[in-house]
Amino acid sequence: MSKEKGKTQNKKRKLTRQEKKQIDALIRQAKGDGKPHTAQDSIPFERMYKDGICRLANGRYSKCIEFEDINYQLAQPDDKTAIFEALCDMYNSFDASISVQLSLISRHANKEDFKSSITIAPQNDDFDSIRAEYTEMLQTQLERGNNGLIKTKFLTFTIEAKDIKSARARLARIETDTLNHFKVIGAAARVLDGKQRLEVLHGLFHPDGERFNFAWEWLPVSGLSVKDFIAPSSFRFGDGRMFQMGGKFGAVSFLQIAAPELSDRMLADFMEAENGIVVNLHIQSIDHNEAIKTIKRKITDLDRMKIEEQKKAIRSGYDMDIIPSDLATYGGEAKNLLRDLQSRNERMFLLTLLVLNLADTKQKLDNEVFGAAAIAQKYNCILTRLDYRQEQGLMSSIPLGENLIHIQRGLTTSSTAVFVPFTVQELFQSGEALYYGLNALSNNMILCDRKKLKNPNGLILGTPGSGKSFSAKREITNAFLITADDIIICDPEAEYYPLVGRLKGQVIKVSQNSTQYINPMDINLNYSEGDTPIALKSDFI
């Protein structure tokens, strides 16, 4: 009896139809419908590792490098050519398995940080009025330029790998090669770790400069994911031509490259927008042999069409050399392209160029987009809104290495490298940095602490009347107000006397009629240990 009971208990009970329906419903709920339902769901990455590797969908992994600007626009033609050729070499080093994203971001900084960097704190002495006046001057100069904006540049490369271990090894090799290329160009570059990449994403999703607060040890305790620390309060993509991100309105457009010739000034003009802009270039290399085969097939097709047109001309009784002009143009361009790929170390790339504009209101957004479109029109290109694809456009405009907009234009290496990401190097240091005027190209403030340089010495050169003395007096005043440095002025013409008097300095007059004097014969017999002081003084005189 007990054995039969045990057999009955070991039998698996069949699920009822109702229970099966409940299980299927739970499975469907866990899988979801593939659509984002929260702001976090819209951000297209699965995991961010501490070392800076980001796992995307479909077994893809990316890493990000931040690089600084260099003085390209002010460089001599030979230097510009060298930078351009170095860019070409870097792009050629990426094979067809590597996707590259070049991100140029201009966004508003935290206002308090900028204010504190130029504000001279009062010290409750006789010079607080001068400090207040000098701070007011600095704030005026700050408003003249775009120092309220932070401009950062990133290069993100993406590969496919079966697991994180193999991805980490290959990404490390690509990282080393890319850093070497930036070193040749002359641009300082560094690899971002996971927290730094999250901070960049947070800055894009919170464009007003909100502070980023995050630590890896907070995740297990809070039960949150990294997306919870970077996501905005909301996304709204209901409108086909724009979107809302928190309290901001935004629009993503793509650049139709219709110009026969491209200029290296285009990206620089985009980045000069007053209210911030984000420009992204998604670059995908094509296998060299496949590119040559494809172009040869196109040339064959064009030749076949040309033969058909010639046959039609003979049948119609007119000159067979008269063929459609477009056919002749395309045939010549295809042959030139084939020659470049075969003999000029050129490769083929697929390029997607996206422009992201953000503003506080719809009207301001339309003005920003119109301004960006005017820049594109200046270079015979067309900036077109991504209708009903704003979400994909936004997520393709953050430096994750994910391109969800496959509107691509085929370009050679030289044509791709024409989009030079460099303009002019800015100098805006914190601490005891002194004001040295405005950048001649960007009109931004120059704040520099020369004591941090290898050689802090300096000369003020210029033609008569160009402001050399004024520059020296301004630097003296600035150093007096914010540092504890000793200031010594040798002034044969006595033009600094009023400044020294206002700053309550000591004036020593050395002349034939003055009571102060310097005795070159004065000697201290104890100042030298090994040599004879009298002999040294005699030799000096």
What are these language model-derived features?
Residues 389-439, 454-455, 463-466, 471, ...:
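Loop-rich catalytic cores of soluble enzymes, especially ATP-dependent carboxylate-amine ligases
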Residues 70, 77, 84-92, 179, ...:
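Glycine-rich phosphate-binding loop of nucleotide-binding enzymes
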Residues 71, 103-114, 128, 132-134, ...:
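Switch/coupling segment of Walker-type NTPase motor domains
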Residues 2-424:
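Extended, folded cores of ATP/NTP-driven motor/assembly subunits in large transport
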Residues 81, 149, 172, 328, ...:
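Conserved structured core elements
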Residues 164, 168, 324-327, 358, ...:
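Hydrophobic alpha-helical scaffolding
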